[in-house]
């Protein structure tokens, strides 16, 4: 004996569509919430606490715009001032503005902040940046206005 399943009615189809739409929205909201787990101010607090001293914008500006013994400075790719899109020095790839006032989503994902500081500091300095250097750069970037 075979059981026939009834053909879905319009109501069950619309209910199913509503559940799918709700699930997709929740997944997107969850992803957005995870991506924005912090703020640039919280990142500055974190690095200042690790360094044991508050970040200083003037030191950050000097660090950001100076070559650190190599060919590049931070501003080689991120621009000077970094309130507009930059361009990677070797690949030519466009880079979003670094200043939080010009790009509110910058420095809002802790994992990405750590990843990009690690990668970019190794490119510019051939080592990781210290917590104090990160705090200084963030203090400088947070103080910039578009």
Positions of predicted regions on the chain:
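Gly/Gly-Pro-rich "capping" loops immediately C-terminal to redox-active cysteine motifs
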Residues: 54, 75-113
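C-type cytochrome heme c attachment motif
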Residues: 62-80, 136-139
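Electrostatic cytochrome c docking/interface patches
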Residues: 36-68
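C-terminal capping alpha-helices of c-type cytochrome domains
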Residues: 114-146
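Bacterial N-terminal signal peptides
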Residues: 21-29
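Soluble non-cytosolic domains of exported or imported proteins
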Residues: 51-54, 68, 107-111, 127-132
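N-terminal secretory signal peptides that target proteins for export/translocation
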Residues: 1-15
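Sec/Tat signal peptide C-region and signal peptidase I cleavage site
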Residues: 31-35
């Amino acid at each position: 004996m075979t059981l026939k399943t009834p053909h879905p009615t319009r109501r069950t189809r619309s209910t199913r569509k509503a559940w799918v739409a709700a699930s997709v929205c929740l997944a997107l909201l969850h992803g957005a919430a995870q991506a924005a787990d912090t703020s640039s101010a919280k990142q500055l607090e974190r690095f200042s606490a690790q360094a044991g001293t508050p970040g200083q914008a003037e030191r950050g500006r000097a660090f950001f715009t100076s070559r650190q013994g190599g060919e590049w400075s931070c501003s080689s790719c991120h621009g000077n001032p970094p309130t507009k899109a930059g361009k990677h020095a070797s690949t030519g790839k466009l880079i979003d503005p670094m200043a939080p006032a010009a790009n509110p989503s910058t420095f809002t994902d802790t994992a990405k902040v750590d990843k990009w500081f690690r990668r970019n500091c190794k490119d510019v300095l051939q080592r990781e940046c210290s917590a104090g250097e990160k705090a200084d750069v963030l203090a400088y970037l947070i103080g910039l206005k578009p």
